[in-house]
Amino acid sequence: MVKTVMPHPVGGQPVAISRKIRWGVLGVAGIAVKKVIPAMQKGARSEIVAIASRELAKARQAAAQLNIPNAYGSYEKLLADPAVDAIYNPLPNHLHVPWSIKAARAGKHVLCEKPIALSVEQTAELIETRNATRVKIGEAFMVRTHPQWLRARDIVMGGGVGELKAVTSTFSYFNRDPNNIRNIVAVGGGAIMDIGCYPITMSRFLFGREPSRVIGFIERDPDMGTDRLTSALLDFAPGHATFTCSTQMVPFQTMQILGTKGRLEIEVPYNIPPDRPSCLFLDDGSELAGRSAEVEECIEMDQYTIQGDEFSRAIQEDGEVPVPLEDALRNMAVIEALFRSAGTGRWEQPQAYAADSGS
């Protein structure tokens, strides 16, 4: 049996929209040009009005390709544009915090790609900047606003799998290009920072609390030094989350959520297809090989469109952004603890930071 699930109401009640939020984009990164910008341009609350690159020709090329009215040859010029309300920051990881801070100080709201920082300390600096400037700053985990994940959490919180006991995930791709930023340690490359952050944030999302301790095992590339294969165990007491992520493994992703009474499988957990329904499989275990599973289809939606509109909604309605900095800080605390654990060979506790008011 296949059941169709309609879009989950992410934000509050609809309100009249006086005008769309005007977005500027820092850089011409592939994810921005190929995925995020085209998706945001379809949104009801967002419009892209400017794009910048350190090379004006590249900015103009992207602007022409994507029908963006303004192109700038420096990030500073875009930040100085009074017609820009908010910034999308898809720059390399080591540039996330510096340019997000500059944008905030220029009075722009900021949606910054994950991981939003390279450390807990950097994330805390962003929190201090946000509090001082009173702009909205959030981390771009697009999965957190997609209806399939909101439905999955509803099932778990509603007892659909019984008591939640285990969340297990795999996320991998193959890339050994030494010039690719994902393979450069100095700019925040490696498997955990690029894709391991997803099973971490979604495990926290499903359990609804923070892990008390974590342990990680890392295999590093002998030439590039990045973590090319990482496996981890997060202790949510009661309950565990495990994941394996790799930058040098066959492309694959999966998510299994197991409880005392059922199992929930998410067909495509992270790169959710925008052009076909995504599926959840809820299995009571009465038959092996998943033959007893019920299928729920979430109608096709682009997670980047939803992400942009929900952030724009937060600006328009002065609400909370989908993934606030306090959440980003806690995710980074887990990442740091896993790196420490890989070095010590022991369990490590994620370290809360004073700037995290929710710790």
Identify what each model region corresponds to.
Residues 2-66:
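N-terminal Rossmann-like dinucleotide-binding module
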Residues 220-227, 236-307, 324, 352, ...:
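NAD(P)-dinucleotide binding in Rossmann-like oxidoreductases
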Residues 46-50, 85-87, 189-190:
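Short active-site oxyanion
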Residues 32, 72, 89, 111-112, ...:
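Hydrophobic residues in well-ordered beta-strands that form the structural core
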Residues 125-142, 162-166:
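Rossmann-fold dehydrogenase core element
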Residues 1-20, 86-88, 313-359:
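C-terminal helix-rich "cap/oligomerization" subdomain common to oxidoreductases
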Residues 66-128:
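Beta-loop-alpha module in the N-terminal Rossmann-like domain of NAD(P)-dependent dehydrogenases
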